[in-house]
Amino acid sequence: QEGCEWESRPCNRGCWLPRQWESVHMRFGVLVLWRAPQFEHFRECCNELRCEALRCMMRMRMEYWPRGLQDQQVYQRARDLEPRKHCGMSYPVECRMPR
């Protein structure tokens, strides 16, 4: 993340707070509340954060990463890390990748 311009920075707070709430309440079986309508904007923000993280990693690849690493590997690596790292969620991410 270092050196990246996060286009979705305003969503960061709304994305992190539910994760803390979720970790506290998951053991009580109320995680289903996350899917309630009032949390929809959190899910959208988290999706945007992950998309920007993927775009950032693709940009970093051009500067720092080994030349032989394929785009698909970069995307897979980012996709494995970002959903749980940023939101603790695993719902599908729809991203427009840079050309």
UniProtKB/Swiss-Prot annotation:
Keywords, in A-Z order: Antibiotic, Antimicrobial
Q: How does it assemble?
A: Heterodimer.
Per the record, the domain of life is: Eukaryota
Function in brief? Has antibacterial activity against Gram-negative Klebsiella sp. but not against E.coli, Proteus sp., Salmonella sp. and Xanthomonas sp. or against Gram-positive bacteria S.pyogenes, S.aureus and Rathayibacter sp. Has no antifungal activity.
Give GO BP annotations, semicolon-separated.
defense response to bacterium
Mind telling me what this protein is named?
Answer: Antimicrobial protein 2
This protein's record includes keyword DNA-binding: no
Which organism does this sequence originate in? Answer: Sesamum indicum
